[in-house]
Regions:
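Active-site loop/oxyanion-hole signature of alpha/beta-hydrolase fold enzymes
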Residues: 1-26
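Gly/Ala-rich beta-loop-alpha elbow adjacent to hydrolase catalytic centers
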Residues: 26-35
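Short, hydrophobic alpha-helix immediately C-terminal to the catalytic nucleophile
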Residues: 36-40, 190
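Flexible "cap/lid" loop of the alpha/beta hydrolase fold
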Residues: 40, 48-78
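Conserved alpha/beta-hydrolase catalytic His-Asp/Glu region
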Residues: 60, 82-139
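Conserved serine/cysteine hydrolase catalytic core
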Residues: 121-164, 181
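Catalytic histidine neighborhood in serine/cysteine hydrolases
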Residues: 166-179
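Catalytic histidine-centered segment of alpha/beta-hydrolase-like enzymes
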Residues: 176-189
Length: 201
């Protein structure tokens, strides 16, 4: 299934269970792309769309296939079994843990344990889709505020992407890594989401 096909399923669920209107949607990584698509397609209405340091990659299909095929054999066992089997990957992870304090461990814990029900094809589809996000530019929906949790440590190019895809994003800068706010500071993350939904941000 494609991103638009999956978005249609989300829209149908919101139509059926919420009358086509929701207060807010949050997504990080690929989930942020879904939030953007929900806003852009205008088939449902949300008051707030919140993206958690999504990268909004738009790689060419060929490059995305190559990256997916290269990384999937390393990443899929982590998703399926909840642990790293590759010695090389384990070594790199240990190095990153020592360099970055609790972030790497918290991020791994946020991913959760083993998911034996996730198929390799599903993982491949998600990884590939995350690399070829089909988002239009300057998304601007009356009555919808787009908020972005911008982790400054992921790089300045991401601010340009956010401003490319959204006409008036409210960017919340944090001197953090990708999804570090959610992984390491969940209380701060929850308070920020609450403040946004109460119109305080």
């Amino acid at each position: 299934p494609t991103m638009p096909e999956e978005t249609e399923k989300i829209e149908a669920y919101i139509q059926e269970h919420s009358g086509g209107h929701i207060r807010a949607a949050y997504g990080c990584s690929l989930g942020g792309s879904f939030v953007g698509l929900l806003a852009a397609r205008r088939n449902i209405h949300m008051d707030y769309g919140i993206l958690g340091s999504s990268d909004l990659d738009q790689t060419s299909p060929l490059a995305a296939k190559l990256q997916t095929n290269l990384l999937l054999p390393l990443l899929y066992p982590v998703i399926r079994d909840g642990k790293i089997k590759s010695r090389l990957l384990q070594k790199r992870l240990e190095k990153r843990k020592s360099e970055m304090g609790g972030y790497v461990q918290a991020f791994m814990e946020m991913l959760g344990g083993a998911r034996p029900y996730v198929t390799m094809q599903s993982c491949k589809n998600q990884f590939y889709s995350d690399l070829v996000t089909p988002l239009p530019d300057k998304i601007d929906v009356p009555g919808t505020e787009i908020h972005i949790f911008y982790a400054l440590k992921i790089g300045e190019k991401y601010r340009a992407r956010y401003e490319q895809h959204f006409a008036r994003p409210v960017i919340h800068e944090q001197d953090l890594q990708h999804e570090e706010l959610l992984a390491c500071y969940p209380e701060r993350w929850a308070q920020l989401v609450k403040d946004i939904m109460e119109g305080k941000q």
